[in-house]
Amino acid sequence: MSSPQNKLSRDAIRDTWLKHTKMNKGNIRYVFLLGESQMTKELEEENFQTMDIILGSFKDTYNNLTYKTMMSFQWATKHCRNAQFVMKTDDDVYVHIPGLKRVINENANALQNAVGGSCQRIASPIRDKRSKWYASFESYPEKTYPGYCSGTGYVTSLNVITKIVEISKTVPFFHLEDVYVALCIKKNGLRLHPISGFMLAYDF
């Protein structure tokens, strides 16, 4: 997933780790997913050159990341029906493609019913209104979140993505996308699968 103003990041990704997809190594495909903004015309022009941008019909804001994530899942189930695995990541993340292929091969069976990445088993809602991750009692009355994988990047099977899309029709909207996906995972009886190869910057 990307933000409209992050063209330099998209170009850097295209010129670095996405080169593997251009050389068809590992049969990997990608798209950048974005919402509507004042830059929609520029994004359409960028896509005319790159043919790798999908625009959703929602405002591209932080509080709409759940819409963006679910759009990406819905798009994958419709346009990637022959895919075995799907990875969701952000435009400020570096993906080591050979490492990703190894991780998928080593965890292929587990990922048939799980989402893998840098996962927390439990976390508490932040009630401070000044926080980027603020959650009101009205939007989330429980004391703890279900376990979740960091939205910076996770991998799973198309089978799991399909199940999440279906169950999302019965899960009320929540603005923190990684928590929302976790709610769908929990309701579906799916699992989290921590993978050591997924590292956040503050993990070092």
Question: Across the structure, where does each feature detected by a protein language model lie?
Answer:
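Secretory-pathway lumenal glyco-enzymes, predominantly type II signal-anchor Golgi glycosyltransferases
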Residues: 1-204
